[in-house]
């Protein structure tokens, strides 16, 4: 193979001398083009320009992969959000730990909002007729609430087990199919602004065991503080999801996330009783939660807050003075004073009669 050597001239052209001695004149355009291209490429110390261009391609590909599922958006904290649009308004479906879970949540919402012909992320995993009937039996707001609370799968499973797949509404589990666990009378702090329910320690460790880590194991202690999610079904067949954890600071077991909403919707007050139970039959040990109102406490609160009712038949007296109607608010007080005065007058009169005529006075008294 011949060796080629280059030499530049004053005119900017270059000549190539071959091994045989022949000179070949070469045009300066390629050199100028290469120099211009070299000026346009950024020069990074220790990194080749070609390598820099190649490393920028996976970033663009990753950005495209983040939106490969319909209705899924990445979150700054590493989680994935799901959303759907209804009449040009965004409906937020919640956040999920992975992209596939968010995509499945979007598919559920799409089936409820747009019917069985809706475009979904997983068309191969088509919903069954029973699931479509379950979606049709609930409103859009109810389905969105299930997705946000991550209880859709549990409610769907319970609904299909009870035969609600063909559009029937929720049927509560009968009392004879439940095994009572324990009861707890809520305190003012349980229904106050602390947004938590303290579960008695003996009942918590017996019925809701939670693995507690030693204080030396910081990772396990953090996981214990975060707690677990427990699903409960109320007397109306609605599923509630609470975060159940152990607080090292107070050494107590508590229900936190989801409890304030339960208190608000059930209208709980201090003195009411929470009843915990579980299913007595079947392979799945379902948990149940119910509340019993304290009617005595409610009546006491009502009487203390309300004014003394007036007689329905008696109307307030109105006096017209100088063309202005003045309602007498203390008419009843004046009537009571007059009645008391009449009683005192009659008593004095009876005493006088008794002094004058003892026999007649004794008869009157």
UniProtKB/Swiss-Prot annotation:
Tagged with keyword Plastid: no
GO cellular component: nucleus
GO molecular function: DNA binding; DNA-binding transcription factor activity
Signal sequence residues: none
InterPro entries the UniProt entry points to: AP2/ERF_dom, AP2/ERF_dom_sf, B3_DNA-bd, DNA-bd_dom_sf, DNA-bd_pseudobarrel_sf, LEC2-like
One Pfam family from the record: AP2
Compartment annotation: Nucleus
Keyword Transcription: yes
DNA-binding region: 68-123, 182-294
Region annotated Disordered, chain positions: 1-24
Keywords from the named record: DNA-binding, Nucleus, Transcription, Transcription regulation
PANTHER family the record matches: AP2_ERF AND B3 DOMAIN-CONTAINING PROTEIN OS01G0141000, B3 DOMAIN-CONTAINING TRANSCRIPTION FACTOR ABI3
Protein name, as recorded: AP2/ERF and B3 domain-containing protein Os01g0141000
